[in-house]
Swiss-Prot record:
The modification N6-acetyllysine is found at residue 607. Residues 321-338 have a biased composition (Basic and acidic residues). A zinc finger (C2H2-type) spans 171-193, 199-221, 227-249, 255-278. There is a cross-link at residues 6, 88, 115, 132, 291, 308, 356, 402, 421, 424 (Glycyl lysine isopeptide (Lys-Gly) (interchain with G-Cter in SUMO2)). InterPro entries: C2H2-ZF_domain, Znf_C2H2_sf, Znf_C2H2_type. GO terms for biological process: regulation of transcription by RNA polymerase II. The lineage of its organism: Eukaryota, Metazoa, Chordata, Craniata, Vertebrata. It comes from Bos taurus. Gene3D superfamilies: Classic Zinc Finger. Interacts with HNRNPDL. Interacts with the 5FMC complex; the interaction requires association with CHTOP. Interacts with CAVIN1. It is found in: Nucleus. Belongs to the krueppel C2H2-type zinc-finger protein family. The modification Phosphoserine is found at residues 51, 250, 301, 306, 412, 665, 784. This is Zinc finger protein 148.
Length: 794
């Protein structure tokens, strides 16, 4: 077999004759057609001279593989992608086969002028393609059937000229418009909306949307953990958990915060970091930006920012305000002064809901300033007076706190407070000697005007039931009186200080409650109790507490009269700590009174003392009748009258439990704000107790006074029900009654130490006799009628 037969048989396998003829015309790919034209005689002569053994044809396969490797290096990846996606139909393949140089094997060793890149490469490609073309007809039909569906990815050209892959998603969810490539993925997604979970665990009845989720869950029950850490040997159900765990050993932190560029090893920690640090921080920045804009606008307009609108801490804000300007410094000082004043006067105006035994008046010393009420009269009266001082003692859960209150130059700082605040402790400060010198002067009206401001009624109080507990339970007082128990409301305990007025109102009250004087226009005074006195038995107190514990809070509208009501507020005059003071002081303003009026008042007051002495000696006869019980704190008290007040409409009283002594509070109020009004007589005006004037014309001795009292006692037909009016008690009459505790007379020393006073049957017949103050020297008491301004004991 010659070489021609071998070559002819080889090319017949690779392609048809028409293909070989067409391929001969396209031998040259480089476009040089003139050089590629070779005569057939020359080719045939060359092929005859040289024979091509079969081994050379087999070696062409190795050349083909090497050429393909070089060709892949020369062709870029993008060109290969374009070639794979775009050249896929039969027509393009047929055209490619037609362009391939089929007849190039005849000119392998012929020195013709062709470009170098197409000599052996094209021959190798042709040989390889000829081998693949043998099995192409059957495989090509199968591939056509598989590719009839839409491709997973489509090669596209972006706007910038780059190549991109587009995935067609023709299956759209009806619920959320999500698109999927296949219907299987769509149906699996729809389970999320419908809540259907077709895959159920056989052991714990948990259900899952996908099967692989169920298989992963079942590993929990079986304990299978196929993934193991190489370093520590820990095993995991999921591969993701193992990979996440390995980052703890390697220290790898692939996740970065986009705000602070901090790295984390887990995604959940990145999310937590963003939520905790950056989201809240952004909100704060927005708030600060808004407030900063407001601050800038306020600074431009000349206003300062309030502390609540500033995001800086309080200390830094104060430093900034101090460094800003002098105006800011002044404003900060004003704010601090206001805050201090508010804290100082807070005990005086505590609300009605905080009346529960909070502030007790420990000591109250009054020193009148030069610019006090009365103008030049007060200035001329004394040159040693100073601004008044008030020391309040706070008693709250075994803690004591003293808060000094520095009074300003006015008569009372209490008048500057708001009308809506409750006047729990309102002390009006009046210098007695100054008022004595300025008695009858029109300037005294200024005091009344100033005192009307802070006085406000105490509305619903939690201590009202405590204040009224003895009112409706008369048998408790009677039982205590028969057992020689003492109930006293002391007015006195005046220390000797030059130009200083000190008064005290001590109330026998329960330790857990506040002394409440519940008038409709009253002021409340809390008095410290004296724990040395044994007043009421514990069983009586427990019974009272049990009885009144069910009452609702609130103020009760109850009117009282002397005829059917027993007065439990007892007033006595305590002079145990009263030294001799030669200068008599007058506390309580009174209008001009003539000598005849004073004489009448003296006569009526003498009758009143006679009745008091008579009831002292015959105390047991009046205990069983509705009467006014006035109890002295000791059987050795001096001969000083004890008074109580009953308002015409509203009864004001104090719960009596323990005696609180040593309490000094000068009190002076207006007639419409009365606490203790002693209603004895037919007068419609309030007659305050006041010290008599400096000049005393009467020189009556003590024996004459006692004789007069005895004669009046005999002439009295009904001493118990007789109404008396208070009259001026001159200095000589008071002289026997202002001794020390050692020299106490025995007029008030009875079996049970009580003085019972009973007024007329109807309360309308009783005017007010308010008790204003007690002189330091206990020289006596004088009251003058005042038709316009009656003073009460507040």
């Amino acid at each position: 077999m010659n070489i021609d037969d071998k070559l002819e048989g080889l090319f017949l396998k690779c392609g048809g004759i028409d293909e070989m003829q067409s391929s001969r015309a396209m031998v040259v790919m480089g476009g040089v057609s003139g050089q590629s034209t070779v005569s057939g005689e020359l080719q045939e002569s060359v092929l005859q001279d040289r024979s091509m053994p079969h081994q050379e044809i087999l070696a062409a396969d190795e050349v083909l593989q090497e050429s393909e490797m070089r060709q892949q290096d020369m062709i870029s990846h993008d060109e290969l992608m374009v070639h794979e996606e775009t050249v896929k139909n039969d027509e393009e393949q047929m055209e490619t086969h037609e362009r391939l140089p089929q007849g190039l094997q005849y000119a392998l060793n012929v020195p013709i002028s062709v470009k170098q890149e197409i000599t052996f490469t094209d021959v190798s490609e042709q040989l390889m393609r000829d081998k693949k073309q043998i099995r192409e007809p059957v495989d090509l039909q199968k591939k056509k059937k598989r590719k009839q569906r839409s491709p997973a990815k489509i090669l596209t050209i972006n706007e910038d000229g780059s190549l991109g892959l587009k995935t067609p998603k023709s299956h759209v969810c009806e619920h959320c418009n999500a698109a999927f490539r296949t219907n299987y993925h769509l149906q699996r997604h729809v389970f999320i909306h419908t809540g259907e979970k077709p895959f159920q665990c056989s052991q714990c009845d948990m259900r899952f949307i996908q099967k692989y989720l169920l298989q992963r869950h079942e590993k929990i029950h079986t304990g299978e953990k196929p993934f193991r850490c190489d370093e520590c040997g820990m095993r995991f159900i999921q591969k993701y958990h193992m990979e996440r765990h390995k980052r703890t050993h390697s220290g790898e932190k692939p996740y970065q915060c986009e705000y602070c560029l901090q790295y984390f090893s887990r995604t959940d920690r990145v999310l937590k970091h963003k939520r905790m640090c950056h989201e809240n921080h952004d909100k704060k920045l927005n708030r600060c930006a808004i407030k900063g804009g407001l601050l800038t606008s306020e600074e431009d307009s000349g206003f300062s920012t309030s502390p609540k609108d500033n995001s800086l801490p309080k200390k830094k804000r104060q430093k900034t305000e101090k460094k800003s300007s002098g105006m800011d410094k002044e404003s900060s000082l004003d704010k601090s002064d206001l805050k201090k004043d508010k804290n100082d006067y807070l005990p005086l105006y505590s609300s009605s809901t905080k009346v529960k035994d909070e502030y007790m008046v420990a000591e109250y010393a009054v020193e009148m300033p030069h610019s006090s009420v009365g103008g030049s009269h007060l200035e001329d009266a004394s040159g040693e007076i100073h601004p008044p001082k008030l020391v309040l003692k706070k008693i709250n859960s075994k803690r004591s706190l003293k808060q000094p209150l520095e009074q300003n130059q006015t008569i009372s700082p209490l008048s500057t407070y708001e009308e809506s605040k409750v006047s729990k402790y309102a002390f009006e400060l009046v210098d007695k000697q100054a008022l004595l010198d300025s008695e009858g002067n029109a300037d005294i009206d200024q005091v009344d005007n100033l005192q009307e401001g802070p006085s406000k009624p105490v509305h619903s109080s939690t201590n009202y039931d405590d204040a009224m507990q003895f009112l409706k339970k008369k048998r408790y007082l009677q039982a205590a009186s028969n057992n020689s128990r003492e109930y006293a409301l002391n007015v006195g305990t005046i220390a000797s200080q030059p130009s200083v007025t000190q008064a005290a109102v001590a109330s026998v009250i329960d330790e857990s409650t506040t002394a409440s004087i519940l008038d409709s226009q009253a002021l409340n005074v809390e008095i410290k109790s004296n724990h040395d006195k044994n007043v009421i038995p514990d069983e009586v107190l427990q019974t009272l507490l049990d009885h009144y514990s069910h009452k609702a809070n609130g103020q009760h509208e109850i009117s009282f009269s002397v005829a059917d009501t027993e007065v439990t507020s007892s007033i006595s005059i305590n002079s145990s700590e009263v030294p001799e003071v030669t200068q008599s002081e007058n506390v309580g303003s009174s209008s001009q009174a003539s000598s005849s009026d004073k004489a009448n008042m003296l006569q009526e007051y003498s009758k009143f003392l006679q009745q008091a002495l008579d009831r002292t000696s015959q105390n047991d006869a009046y205990l069983n009748s509705p009467s006014l019980n006035f109890v002295t704190d000791n059987q050795t008290l001096p001969n000083q009258p004890a008074f109580s007040s009953i308002d015409k409409q509203v009864y004001a009283t104090m719960p009596i439990n323990s005696f609180r002594s040593g309490m000094n509070s000068p009190l002076r109020t207006t007639p419409d704000k009365s606490h203790f009004g002693l209603i004895v007589g037919d007068s419609q005006h309030s007659f305050p107790f006041s010290g008599d004037e400096t000049n005393h014309a009467s020189a009556t001795s003590t024996q004459d006074f006692l004789d007069q009292v005895t004669s009046q006692k005999k002439a009295e037909a009904q001493p118990v029900h007789q109404a008396y009016q208070m009259s001026s008690f001159e200095q000589p009459f008071r002289a026997p009654y202002h001794g020390s505790r050692a020299g106490i007379a025995t007029q008030f020393s009875t079996a049970n130490g009580q003085v019972n006073l009973r007024g007329p049957g109807t309360s309308a017949e009783f005017p007010e006799f308010p008790l204003v103050n007690v002189n330091d020297n206990r020289a006596g008491m004088t009251s003058s009628p005042d038709a316009t301004t009656g003073q009460t004991f507040g």
